Amino acid sequence: MRHSIAPERRASIAAGILCLLIACAVALVVLTRERILLSVTLDLPGAVPGASDPSPRFEFARVDLGMAVILLLVFSAIMRTAYRIPGSRWIERGLVTPITIFLIAGLNGITDAGSLIAIYSLTSAMVLFDMAQLRASRLSATSPWALGTMVGIVPWGIIALHQVGGGLAGHPAPIFVQVITMTVLVLTAGASFAFWRERAGRTTAQWHIALSTTTTCLFAVEAAALIVTA
C-alpha cells in the first residue's frame, strides 16, 4: 500500500530542492568572482570616558558573504528535505533567519561585534517566541507571536539607524544593498504574517514555507548579483 505525502511535506521537499539548485549557482559565482568579506570589529577598553581619543578598534574576523550564503542554502535544503526529523522546519528557521539578518547588517556597514550579536540574538528570540506560539491556545495582543513581533522589529531598527546615519554622514549604503534590505524585510514580515494566519486557522503551512524559502533564495540570488557587480 502506497502512502501519500502530505501537502506540507511536498512543499518542504520542493523548497529544499530549490535551495540546493540555487546553492550550486551561487557556488559557481563565488568560485569565479572576487570575494566580498564583511568585517567584524571590536572596540577595546582603555580610553578615558569623555576623552577625544576613541577606544582602539581592531578587526578580529571577516565573514565571506558568498560562502555564508552557500552554507545557508545547503543547510536549508537539508532541513527542508529531511522532514522526518522532528522540528526540522523550526531548526532551519531558527538558524537561517538570524544569520540572514546578520549578513544584511554587515552589508549595511554594521561591523561592531556587540551590535551584530544583538541583532542575531533578538532575531533568534523572535523565532523562539513563534515556536512558543505553537503551544499557546490562542492569539492575542500578549501572545508569544505578538511579543516575538515586537522583539523582531528591533534588529531592523538598528539597521535602519545605520542606513540613515550613513546617509546623513554622506556615506549612504549602495542602492543595491538598500534593495536587498527592503526585500528581505518585506518577505520576513510576510512570512511572520503567514505564520500568524496559520495559527489562526486561516491558511495552511505551505504559505509560510513558501515565503520563508523565497526570503532565503531571493537573498541568495541578490547576494550573488552583488558579488558579480562588485
Residue ranges and their predicted role:
Residues 2-88, 92, 97-230:
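Polytopic alpha-helical membrane-helix bundles and their juxtamembrane interface segments
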